[in-house]
């Protein structure tokens, strides 16, 4: 019962955090940044899965050859540290348990109960479609900005950023797959 109450409290805190994103910081560069270029992103993440929820921070350092993500819990503690490179992926959870795999999504589900579509997330945070996505699976608004796509079982929804120099980049992502819902609020994204 106590865990159920904590899960609901965490979900409420996450929704309040997501609602307070009106003051997003401007992006470091205009829309010329591509998914193959290095960047650093900071934001907030909320995941709902089964009868549980996670909310906290996300910090991500991306290069074409590697990714490093830190997921922080609501009180600032590290919930997971994820490293991906040519040899595969390593996830270290809050209990210092390490999982190594060539399939990060499966490792995240095994460890945390939810996952991120890391293989294509660099495209999504930039408001771009991965090359493998068919045009029929992509929806754009009147300004030709990406608002939704379907890929690898994930349904991705994009909320456009309102800063003048944001280009096609979204302010928020909502990602759904099976019984998992993940929301990311992008507070800052800079080229490195």
Regions found by a protein language model. Name each.
Residues 1-23:
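Sec-dependent bacterial lipoprotein signal peptides
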Residues 95-149:
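Flexible, processing/modification-adjacent segments and terminal tails
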């Amino acid at each position: 019962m106590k865990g159920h109450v904590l899960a609901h409290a965490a979900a409420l805190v996450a929704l309040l955090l997501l609602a307070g994103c009106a003051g997003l910081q401007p992006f470091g560069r205009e829309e010329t940044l591509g998914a193959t270029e290095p960047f650093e992103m900071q934001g907030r993440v909320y995941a709902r899965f089964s009868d549980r929820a996670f909310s906290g921070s996300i910090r991500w350092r991306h290069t074409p050859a590697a990714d490093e993500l830190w997921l922080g819990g609501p009180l600032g503690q590290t919930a997971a540290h994820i490293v991906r490179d040519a040899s595969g992926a390593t996830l270290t959870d809050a209990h210092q348990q390490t999982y190594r795999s060539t399939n990060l999504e499966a490792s995240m589900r095994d460890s945390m109960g939810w996952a991120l579509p890391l293989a294509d997330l660099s495209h999504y945070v930039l408001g771009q479609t991965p090359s493998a996505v068919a045009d029929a699976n992509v929806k754009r608004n009147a300004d030709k900005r990406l608002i939704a796509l379907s890929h690898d079982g994930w349904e991705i929804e994009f909320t456009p950023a309102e800063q003048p120099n944001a280009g096609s980049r979204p302010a928020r992502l909502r990602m759904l797959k099976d019984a998992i819902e993940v929301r990311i609020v992008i507070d800052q994204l800079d080229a490195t």
